[in-house]
């Protein structure tokens, strides 16, 4: 086989080699093979005329070339270079001469000894496995699964209600209420995310959630929710009282199952979701005081009413995303009703804050302070409502240019109302704590004693 391939290879490498192969050793070799075939057996003449075949390793090409003429040396050099490239043999010595490879029909990239050593070492080297970050793998995904900002808001509303209750508080009770409420809220939020990855994937606001990104599977979310809910309810039962534990479990069921299911069926889901926000103040109050006190229901009503200007203005600016994702929201089903409800519950804040003073939860100065904060949010809610009412009048609605201008203004008013609501709730609750009934009596008692 090699007797046929090597002459063809040499002819392809250099046209001048064809005459050499025919006139030289190659021609005598062909004649000898032909004569041996005709004779049918070997004899002394064939042994004398037989041409010696070079079987030396290619490493000794330099030795074989010694003593040959220039043409034969060039031929053997090209032949050795070609065979060297075809054999892919990298065990060459550094003293081997460099051959001219311009006539080769393929490109040969020479690799020196140092480079070959680096390649071998890189192949033998075992790359270390990347370190698994505990924070990025476990802590951050499950922290996002609990919706930390919403959970903190729920926890603070329960703590503020606990601080406003008339009965004394204990450190153990406060810690149990804080941890238990946080875990119950995290459980409800995890179930909500585990049930809605396909819908959340269609909204920009929720595309970064861990279940949507595949960092946490729905089953893992449900397992986390089960563990957090069980632990949170147990802490509330043992560290606070059974009433608070029942309210915590009810909050999980309302948010994770009823509210989440209604989001794709009816606009009443917003009212059900507002009930979820009203339960944490009841939990805080029930931790140390009976729920028969009207002050508990005033605080719950305050949190319930606050949900509408906050959420309705938020959903207004992303109404198309809700619609495309299949969520049935008032913002796109009935835009006028959406703005009207936001204003209605903003105005409801005034009598609810009045009720806190009337039922001796706060002093009467609270009416003045809270009125400024409530008026601030009601003003922007009124602007949002009035603009939407004007937008959907017959004159403006049928004029596309005017309607688009009016809708742009409504978007601005909705965004302002939303951010005002974010500041409104902590302001109202902090003012209520500062104006708690009999909080500052110790200052006046000292003055009375000094005057007496």
Curated annotation (Swiss-Prot):
Family according to the record: Belongs to the UbiA prenyltransferase family.
Entry keyword annotation includes Methyltransferase: no
Protein name (Swiss-Prot/TrEMBL): Protoheme IX farnesyltransferase, mitochondrial
Matches recorded under NCBIfam families: cyoE_ctaB
PANTHER family: PROTOHEME IX FARNESYLTRANSFERASE, MITOCHONDRIAL
InterPro entries (UniProt xref): Protohaem_IX_farnesylTrfase (IPR006369), Protohaem_IX_farnesylTrfase_mt (IPR016315), UbiA_prenyltransferase (IPR000537), UbiA_prenylTrfase_CS (IPR030470), UbiA_sf (IPR044878)
Signal peptide: none
Membrane topology: Multi-pass membrane protein
GO cellular component, as recorded: mitochondrial membrane
Function recorded in the entry: Converts protoheme IX and farnesyl diphosphate to heme O.
CDD domains (alphabetical): PT_UbiA_Cox10
One GO MF term: protoheme IX farnesyltransferase activity
Cellular localisation: Mitochondrion membrane
E.C. numbers: 2.5.1.-
Organism whose genome encodes this protein: Kluyveromyces lactis (strain ATCC 8585 / CBS 2359 / DSM 70799 / NBRC 1267 / NRRL Y-1140 / WM37)
Stretches of the chain forming a coiled coil according to its record: none
């Amino acid at each position: 086989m090699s007797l046929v391939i090597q002459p063809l290879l040499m002819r392809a490498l250099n046209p001048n080699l064809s005459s050499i192969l025919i006139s030289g050793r190659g021609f005598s070799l062909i004649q000898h093979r032909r004569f041996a075939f005709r004779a049918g057996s070997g004899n002394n003449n064939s042994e004398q005329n037989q041409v010696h075949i070079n079987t030396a390793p290619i490493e000794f090409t330099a030795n074989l070339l010694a003593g040959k003429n220039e043409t034969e040396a060039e031929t053997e050099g090209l032949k050795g270079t070609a065979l060297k490239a075809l054999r892919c043999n990298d065990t060459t010595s550094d003293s081997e001469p460099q051959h001219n490879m311009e006539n080769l029909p393929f490109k040969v990239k020479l690799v020196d000894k140092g480079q070959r050593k680096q390649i071998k070492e890189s192949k033998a080297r075992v790359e270390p496995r990347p370190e698994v970050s505990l924070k990025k793998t476990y802590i951050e995904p499950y922290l996002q699964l609990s919706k930390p900002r919403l959970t903190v808001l729920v926890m603070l509303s329960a703590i503020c209600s606990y601080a406003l209750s008339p009965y004394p508080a204990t450190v153990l009770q406060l810690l149990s209420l804080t941890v238990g409420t946080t875990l119950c809220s995290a459980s409800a939020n995890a179930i909500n995310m585990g049930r809605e990855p396909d819908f959340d994937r269609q909204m920009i606001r929720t595309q970064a959630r861990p279940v949507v990104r595949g960092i946490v599977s729905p089953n893992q979310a449900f397992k986390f929710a089960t563990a957090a809910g069980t632990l949170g309810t147990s802490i509330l039962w043992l560290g606070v009282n059974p009433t608070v534990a029942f309210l915590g479990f009810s909050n999980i069921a309302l948010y994770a199952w009823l509210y989440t299911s209604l989001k794709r069926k009816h606009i009443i889901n917003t009212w059900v979701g507002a009930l979820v926000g009203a339960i944490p103040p009841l939990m805080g109050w029930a931790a140390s005081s009976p729920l028969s006190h009207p002050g508990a229901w005033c605080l719950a009503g305050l949190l319930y009413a606050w949900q509408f200007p906050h959420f309705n203005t938020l959903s207004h600016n992303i109404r198309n995303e809700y619609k495309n994702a299949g969520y049935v929201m008032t913002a796109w089903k009935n835009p006028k009703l959406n703005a009207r409800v936001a204003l209605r519950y903003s105005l409801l804040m005034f009598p609810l804050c009045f009720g806190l003073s009337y039922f001796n939860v706060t002093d009467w100065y609270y009416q003045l302070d809270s009125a400024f904060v409530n008026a601030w949010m009601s003003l922007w809610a009124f602007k949002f409502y009035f603009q939407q009412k004007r937008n959907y009048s017959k004159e403006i609605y049928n004029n596309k240019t005017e309607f688009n201008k009016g809708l742009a203004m409504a978007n601005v008013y909705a965004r302002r109302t939303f951010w005002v609501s974010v500041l409104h709730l902590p302001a109202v609750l902090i003012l209520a704590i500062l104006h708690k009934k009999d909080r500052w009596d110790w200052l006046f008692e000292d003055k009375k004693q000094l005057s007496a």
